[in-house]
């Protein structure tokens, strides 16, 4: 009986830890409603030096950020310099193109459709100066097919549109 109790406590602690890592996505119903009624659910597949992405209407960021600014989110750093791509859905990173020998994506220039599904907020482990990233998860089977066609594995993370970032607060000295 003691073993079962210990196992129960262990499983509850494990479950509580995984749930605690989830961050609520504020204003998600309003954001999804706005995207459904006001923004296109398609973009153009593009390639910028091995970075393959779906180029989207920049209103995905410029309009939707207004729903989450009061929560400390800012526009992601996708604008300003000529090499920045604005609102997008990442399909393939340059490192993947190199690793899997992808030279050319024949589908570039084609329209890609997607369906916004849900909102998520995550702590990005590799983006050191950013505390949280707010994005819209999208369903885009065409993008899975493209990755498969060029020999890439299924993505580790869902296809998504980043609409906001929350910078880490500087610690007081």
Residues of each region from the PLM?
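Sec-dependent signal peptide recognition
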Residues: 2-9
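Hydrophobic h-region of N-terminal signal peptides that target proteins for export
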Residues: 11-19
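Histidine-dependent nucleotide/RNA phosphoesterase domain, centered on the 2H-phosphoesterase fold
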Residues: 21-173
């Amino acid at each position: 009986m003691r073993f079962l109790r210990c196992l129960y406590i262990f499983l509850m602690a494990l479950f509580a830890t995984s749930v605690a890592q989830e961050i609520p996505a504020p204003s998600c119903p309003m954001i999804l409603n706005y995207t459904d009624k006001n923004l296109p659910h398609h973009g153009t597949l593009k390639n910028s030096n091995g970075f393959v992405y779906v180029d989207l209407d920049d209103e995905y960021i410029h309009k939707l950020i207004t729903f989450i600014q009061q929560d400390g989110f800012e526009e992601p750093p996708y604008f300003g310099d000529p090499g920045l791509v604005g609102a997008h859905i990442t399909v393939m990173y340059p490192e993947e193109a190199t690793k899997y020998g992808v030279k050319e994506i024949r589908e570039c220039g084609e329209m890609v459709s997607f369906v916004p599904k849900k909102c998520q907020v995550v702590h990005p482990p590799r983006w050191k100066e950013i505390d949280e990233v707010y994005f819209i998860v999208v369903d885009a089977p065409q993008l899975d097919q493209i990755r498969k066609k060029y020999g890439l594995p299924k993505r580790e993370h869902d296809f998504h549109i980043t609409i906001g970032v929350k910078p880490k607060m500087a610690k007081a000295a």
